[in-house]
Swiss-Prot record:
It is a multi-pass membrane protein. Its main location: endoplasmic reticulum. The keyword Endoplasmic reticulum applies. The chain crosses the membrane at residues 3-23, 38-58, 69-89, 141-161, 171-191, 208-228, 235-255, 277-297, 317-337, 349-369. Keywords: Amino-acid transport, Disulfide bond, Endoplasmic reticulum, Membrane, Phosphoprotein, Transmembrane, Transmembrane helix, Transport. It comes from the Eukaryota. Recruits the lipid transfer protein VPS13A from lipid droplets to the endoplasmic reticulum (ER) membrane. The gene is Xk. It comes from Rattus norvegicus. Heterodimer with Kell; disulfide-linked. Interacts with VPS13A. Residues 1-2, 59-68, 162-170, 229-234, 298-316, 370-445 are cytoplasmic. It is found in: Endoplasmic reticulum membrane. PANTHER family: ENDOPLASMIC RETICULUM MEMBRANE ADAPTER PROTEIN XK, MEMBRANE TRANSPORT PROTEIN XK FAMILY MEMBER. This is Endoplasmic reticulum membrane adapter protein XK. Residues 24-37, 90-140, 192-207, 256-276, 338-348 are extracellular.
């Protein structure tokens, strides 16, 4: 049975980040900074509450008689209790006989164009561990993008304003680790959801590549937002609201345009109001993820599983192009409106470093999809093929514009030859004209 390392990592980041935030809020209270204290506590306690609700919802404990579990979640200690429960199940799994065994069927990755279906016995303990891993993965994503991301942005903004790095703020680098880990779990969840019928095995190099990709992407995004906020405090509200509502409303707009009925089968115990609340929370999380990085999971409300399983390279390309343009514009505005606190900062060099950092994240993303994606054999087209097709399209369009004038000369020669009753000779034409004449000849046949 696989060691529950992901559960341990999720609980460690949850506890460490919460303790660091509480310590930092106490330092703000001692210094008399009530506003910073309130915001730090809010971005710490709000995701804690959402994590407790997520664990209760996934395990369906609200409809079961488990008062101790409910009490631990009310005390914000639910993840610790669940972690102890996970390791108890793991340690006792080899000692007790499984009273119930289910059989799952998974297809292996294709080899030489063939894919075999493999049956696997899953015991009761392994099934419970799978549920715990799934719950903690979702909790890590919620904690990362609804708590850690705004918390890291806030603390970095305070550091820039006060030009002082305290011990508490340095400890908040845990927030960056939490965001990167949440994005990594989001990638793994997306792969397992899209390729649910296959046996997916993620190699260590794939984890390293995703970690580097997400680290560069999220770090540069947070720094860009902080720099822009430090000089244009009012306009950053506009930027955040436009980003948030664009991604929040996008799944709903697609749902309304599809004309599909309202989804009723998300959870049998939920009413229509409860389903609406769950969908609203999912779109809120979807918008929060896309605010800082690319969401590997694409929300699709008209789908019974709420997740789109198609691999849309064009949506990925458009997202990173628009995000790169947005980051560049925000950095240029910061450069023109920067204040005296950046007197000793080489602004052009900083802008160049941030843009190179974002391009580095895109490079690691392309490397992951090209070489380390566990299901790359199932892609209809690889990253390199899509990139080559895009380059060919650009080159073809530019060549077509350049060959407009030779085409005119060809038409004149053809008309003259036709009037004389002679066959045109391609040897007198330029190479470009010869290619075009061949294409015309083929099309006419």
């Amino acid at each position: 049975m696989k060691f529950p390392a992901s559960v341990l990592a999720s609980v460690f980041l949850f506890v460490a980040e919460t303790m660091a935030a509480l310590y930092l809020s106490s330092t703000y209270r001692s210094a008399g900074d009530r506003m910073w204290q309130a915001l730090t506590l809010f971005f710490s306690l709000m995701p804690c509450t959402l994590v407790q609700l997520t664990l209760l919802f996934v395990h369906r404990d609200l409809s079961r008689d488990r008062p101790l579990v409910l009490l631990m979640h009310l005390l914000q200690l639910g993840p610790l209790y669940r972690c102890c429960e996970v390791f108890c199940i793991y340690c006792q799994s080899d000692q007790n006989e499984e009273p119930y065994v289910s059989i799952t069927k998974k297809r292996q990755m294709p080899k030489d164009g063939l894919s075999e279906e493999v049956e696997k016995e899953v015991g009761q303990s392994e099934g419970k561990l799978f549920t715990h891993r799934s719950a903690f993965s979702r909790a890590s994503v919620i904690q990362a993008f609804l708590g850690s991301a705004p918390q890291l942005t806030l603390q970095l903004y305070i550091t820039v304003l006060e030009q002082n790095i305290t011990t508490g703020r340095f400890i908040m680098v845990l927030s960056l680790l939490s965001i990167v880990y949440g994005a990594l779990r989001c990638n793994i969840l997306a792969i397992k959801i899209k390729y649910d019928e296959y046996e997916v095995k993620v190699k260590p190099l794939a984890y390293v590549c995703i970690f580097l990709w997400r680290s560069f992407e999220i770090a540069t995004r947070v720094i860009v937002l902080v720099l822009f906020t430090s000089v244009l405090k009012i306009w950053v509200v506009v930027v955040i609201l436009v980003n948030f509502f664009s991604f929040f409303l996008y799944p709903w707009i697609l749902f309304w345009n599809s004309g599909s009925p309202f989804p009723e089968n998300i959870e049998k115990a939920l009413t229509r109001v409860g389903t609406t609340i769950v969908l609203g929370f999912l779109t809120l999380l979807y918008a929060g993820i896309n605010m800082f990085c690319w969401s590997a999971v694409q929300l699709k409300i008209d789908n019974p599983e709420l997740i789109s399983k198609s691999q849309n390279w064009y949506r990925l390309l458009i997202y990173y192009m628009m995000r790169f343009v947005e980051n560049s514009v925000l950095l240029l505005l910061w450069f023109f409106f920067k204040t005296d606190i950046y007197m000793y900062v080489c602004a052009p060099l900083l802008i160049l470093q941030l843009l190179i950092g974002y391009c580095t994240s895109i490079l690691f993303m392309l490397v992951f999809y090209q070489f380390f994606h566990p299901c790359k054999k199932l892609f209809s087209s690889s990253v390199s093929e899509s990139f080559s097709a895009c380059l060919r399209c650009v080159c073809w369009s530019s060549a077509r514009r350049k060959s407009t004038e030779p085409v005119g000369r060809i038409d004149t020669d053809l008309k003259a030859c036709t009037d004389q009753g002679a066959q045109p000779s391609t040897s007198k034409l330029t190479p470009e004209a010869t290619e075009i004449w061949t294409a015309v000849d083929l099309c006419s046949t």
